[in-house]
């Protein structure tokens, strides 16, 4: 789906229905799950700013408060998971300014795919997957590969994430699911 109005205009997402569950995974926001329903009842929180596409309120200091939407979860990291801070030159870690909850939560997914297939056990499996790259020229290059799986008729989802450092140097890693 693609949202057409307001701050969500242009936001691309994938809607999955497995019988008792309905959820929406945002392709433009790290495949985080923004809506989650069980038998038609909403189980998620939506913050006052509402749904947002990637915009100017993403990665500077406290401006994240203008784009954090809530949802079932959003991914925080990889260089910061809490309040914004600045690392000085000459320290143990690379110098820089790190926004509230990091940048990965606003990173659009690449190589996005959705699939539905039968298993040998007779389960009908629904999957959404993609990868997000948090990178900077001469800096970090961290790639998260995410797969969200649900089995038709079962009231659960499984989120599998793997982060790989594809940089030329060791990188600090902070990672949190904000629920």
Language model: regions and residue ranges:
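Surface-exposed acidic/polar loop and edge beta-strand patches at domain peripheries
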Residues: 1-152, 156-158, 170
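A conserved active-site cap/scaffold subdomain adjacent to cofactor or substrate pockets
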Residues: 160-164, 173
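Short, acidic/polar linear motifs in exposed loop/turn regions
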Residues: 166-168
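Histidine-centered catalytic micro-motifs
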Residues: 174-179
């Amino acid at each position: 789906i693609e949202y057409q109005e307001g701050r969500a205009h242009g936001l691309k997402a994938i809607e999955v229905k497995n019988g008792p569950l309905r959820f929406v995974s945002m392709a433009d926001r790290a495949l985080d799950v923004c809506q989650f329903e069980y038998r038609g009842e909403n189980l998620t929180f939506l913050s006052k700013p509402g749904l947002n596409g990637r915009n100017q309120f993403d990665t500077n200091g406290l401006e994240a408060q203008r784009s954090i939407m809530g949802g079932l979860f959003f991914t925080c990291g990889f260089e910061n998971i809490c309040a914004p801070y600045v690392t000085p030159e000459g320290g143990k870690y690379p110098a820089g300014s790190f926004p509230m909850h990091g940048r990965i939560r606003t990173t659009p997914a690449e190589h996005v795919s959705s699939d539905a297939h039968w298993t040998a056990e007779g389960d009908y499996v629904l999957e959404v997957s993609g990868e997000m790259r948090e990178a900077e020229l001469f800096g970090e290059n961290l790639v998260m590969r995410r797969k969200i799986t649900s089995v038709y008729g079962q009231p659960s989802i499984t989120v599998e994430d793997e982060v790989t450092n594809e940089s030329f140097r060791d990188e600090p890693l902070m990672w949190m699911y904000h629920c």
